[in-house]
Amino acid sequence: MTLVFALDLAACSVISVDLTPRVRPLEEETVEGRGDAKIVIVELAGVLSDAESAPILSVGNPPARVPLLVRLREELMKASDDSKVRAIVLRINSPGGTVTASDIIYRELMLFREKARVPIIAALMDVAASGGYYAALAADSIVAHPTTITGSIGTIMLTVNAQGPMDKLGLAAITVKSGEHKDMGSPFRALTPEERQMFQSVIDDLHGQFVKLVAERRRLPRPTAARLADGRIYTAEQALQLKLIDAIGYLPDVLAQARKAAGVEEARIVVYKRPREYRATYYAKAETGGSAVEAALAPLATLGMSGPRFLYLWWP
């Protein structure tokens, strides 16, 4: 938003004041530790989506936010260009998100590993389920907090059927289409059995990709991975017994493991932040995290009214 004031003085002057929030480049901040080597904490929080993360509830001019995928790539590029970065700690607190966003995050992390040749240790926090766990599969090692909820390996499609309420209101949607199934999944009519089967085939295919990745990255037999991927959630202890994770520990334990994997005895723990963004310790959240209310409403914002969405998401 730009305000323009015209002042009639000796010569006409125009003063332009730009009140639009500006996104500034990331800065590096050391939150603890010492030495030349660096361990960078990268955060994945909230619903994984390529949508802009503008506040759902805000008063006045909302602060500038950067979409999660944009921020992730920006952080990984900054880390890969720094020869002193010896390890990445990927802190995950997410129930998952869209299939595509989850897969892009996994791919970006794998590309970083290939380029930078530094270990990635995933630290699972409150929830690292479905797409959150999918992203963790890119790590060299997965460590869960003792109270982490993970798993929910599977695919879901959510849509809305408003036909009943519209019928009661005497409203009807008029659709002109080129083919019988062009509007399949529309909220204005129910699915036919044939269309439900079509959607199920898509779900099964996307689910198969998830299961294949679990089997490959966790070195599990495909039938075992498929058995674990029925959508249920697991505690940290259950996930460890099922070989879905490598260890249980706290964030300091993860940092110690990162130092060991990097082959250094001491290192600076580094986060990337925007100017004025508060990140004084390794527990501080990045700007994309949002408030608790925003986190609760984020799945609704992700789904929107744009039709069916295919999700790697745990949303009880």
Q: Which residues are covered by each model-predicted region?
A:
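N-terminal organellar transit peptides
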Residues: 1-145, 156-316
